[in-house]
Structures are given as C-alpha cells and as structure tokens.
Amino acid sequence: MPSPRLLVIEGNSPQTMAEHVSFGGVPASTGYSDLLRELLPGAAVDICHPADPGAVLPDGQSLQGYDGIAITGSSLHIYNGGAAVTRQIDLVREALTTGTPLFGSCWGLQIITVAAGGVVRKNPNGREIGFGRGIRLTAAGRQHPMYVGKLDVFNAPTVHLDEVETLPPGATVLALSLIHI
C-alpha cells in the first residue's frame, strides 16, 4: 500500500499561531502533522493556512490529491464571520465535493458542519474547559472504526465555547456529551 498523502488545515489566524509560539507552543497544524507522521511513517503531510489572506494549497496539489484531510481547532468563532472564517468554509465546502475523508476537531467539526449546511452557535451553557466529561458514544459511534476499543462513556481533553445547533443533512452523530455535540 502506498504511503498516504494527507492535508492538515490550520484553523487559526497568523496572530493566534504567533501567540502560541511566543508561549513556547507550536501551531496546531504542526502538532497534527507531527502526530500523523509518527502514526503513519512515510506519510506525506501538507499544511494549508486558509485563515491567511492569499493562502493556497502547496504547488501542484488539489484537494482531490489527498487521501485524507484533518482540520485543527481554532480560536475563531463561525458566528463572528469575517474573511478568515469565510475562506475556511469555502475550502471545506470544496473538500466535501471530492469525497476525500475529512476529520475535524472542535473548530474543524464546526467548519465541516456549516460547509455542509448545518448551524453552529455559541453554547448557552457556556465554555467547557479541561476535560469533557461523560462523552457517550451513540450506536453509530460504537460501530465506527475511529472508536474501536473505546469505552462507551469516556472523558477527553477539551476547550470550546461553541456547539452544533443543527446537523447538516445526512450527518450522523457518533458521540456527544450533556453539554455539547
């Protein structure tokens, strides 16, 4: 089997990435890329920064050329709008037409939701920070390969304020908590 070609879409603005670096961290896309290369030795991993004005895919690449796409978290909020948000929605909307598998974490889930026709809002229950507690797999989640070996109820590190209010047509919920989908 040939090595996979993967795309990581950085959800943060250049300012947020610079702030992470100034505190000794790395941009989310760097962390994702490093982890993917560790889990899949030999994988080719590209990074795209659609929050940046003028950002493009690496030379010679198209979304159809990837075996998978991962979208990071972000400090942005979809309901605040703006060019950085719109560019990401447009890119993901295009990615959805390719049939390439997409994985979205937090912001990534929100961008995929909106690009596919769903609605995201600020959670009326407030921010969840630290650990999401009591995350429950649905029947579909228990059958999904991503959750093989996972407990039916688990905790996971989390920081988010927003939630999916309305699922896009055809979406399937794999897991949820009492606070957020």
Name each model-derived stretch:
Residues 1-87, 94-98:
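N-terminal beta1-alpha1 cap of cysteine-dependent amidohydrolase-like domains
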Residues 47-56, 137, 156, 175:
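Short gly/ser/thr-rich secondary-structure transition/capping motifs
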Residues 74-141:
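Cysteine-nucleophile active-site neighborhood
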Residues 161, 171:
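Anionic-ligand binding region
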Residues 168:
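Conserved binding/recognition cores within well-folded domains
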